Amino acid sequence: MIVLGIETSCDETSVALVEDNTVIANLVYSQIQIHKKFGGVVPEIAAREHLKRLPILFSELISQTNINIERIDGIAVTKGPGLIGALLVGVSFAKGLALRYKKPLVGINHIIGHVYSNYLAYPDLKPPYIVLMVSGGHTLILKVEENNNVTILGRSVDDAVGEAFDKIARLLGLGYPGGPEIDKISKNGNPNAFNFPKPKMYDPDYNFSFSGLKTAVLYEIKRLTKSGYSENNLPIPDLAASAQEVMIDVLLHKVTKAARDNNLKNIVLAGGVAANSRLREKIRALSEEFNFYIPPLEYCSDNAAMIARAGLERIKSGENDGLNFEPVPNFFEMMST
């Protein structure tokens, strides 16, 4: 079975063809360079770029794979959560194709799509397992049960971890997006140089809070400046490495606690922050107790291959949302549908 995936939830335009667990092609157009000068994603610009790029990318996909759309068994498109304008572009395009070529169409939860990115690398992966979802928009701990029911065990009560990376990077004068910049510069820093607080780390629940860490970094920069450092000679690698270490320690403490409390050994990572090299390094130290599933780097960020793979399950079982669904930008509304 071949499924076409379409992803336009934020600032990546992506289309893919997936046959079972094999990615035939996965094309991604990133808008990072466009949004970089604004220090973050501008929703209206993102939607306009999707509108411009999606038809071009789709034509390239068909041309490169030499697979006629008549051979495609179904279409999967990101339904939400995400930016409403961006989502509308993808959903409208998918509906047009489904109507024109009489193909089944399913709307996919973007969060679940990230989970399914692991199935592209680990086709034998099966529930139950715990998910650590770490991205610019969401930080979640999920429990996926054998019947594929998903329960939210924990979430960030303020900033998502990817958002915290961006904000701390801005404080340190680094570029956008902040996660890769902090990851890179931290390799030259001491992760124990600064004793930043670890918010909610030892609370009994599985929730996260990262806004206080951003404030702690800001106060440390002010303290260093008052003590004689100029803005040009601040110990940026040490500050970045120390802040990154706190975020990773909190993430791993919470997700392993959730796994132990639920008597589960399998932990699945998902989302853009799963590409962080320090996170991957520290996971290796836990590999004797837990089985970690980490998506390949190319499937950590938003992509249509993961959407196609998630849709394949539903289309194979005969599901078809048809044309009677709309994008759902809100996370909690999306998780309840």
Swiss-Prot record:
GO terms for molecular function: iron ion binding; N(6)-L-threonylcarbamoyladenine synthase activity. It catalyses: L-threonylcarbamoyladenylate + adenosine(37) in tRNA = N(6)-L-threonylcarbamoyladenosine(37) in tRNA + AMP + H(+). Its EC number is 2.3.1.234. Fe cation binds at residues 110, 114, 302. The keyword Membrane does not apply. One of its GO terms (cellular component) is cytoplasm. Disulfide bonds: none annotated. Belongs to the KAE1 / TsaD family. Required for the formation of a threonylcarbamoyl group on adenosine at position 37 (t(6)A37) in tRNAs that read codons beginning with adenine. Is involved in the transfer of the threonylcarbamoyl moiety of threonylcarbamoyl-AMP (TC-AMP) to the N6 group of A37, together with TsaE and TsaB. TsaD likely plays a direct catalytic role in this reaction. This is tRNA N6-adenosine threonylcarbamoyltransferase. It comes from Fervidobacterium nodosum (strain ATCC 35602 / DSM 5306 / Rt17-B1). The gene is tsaD.
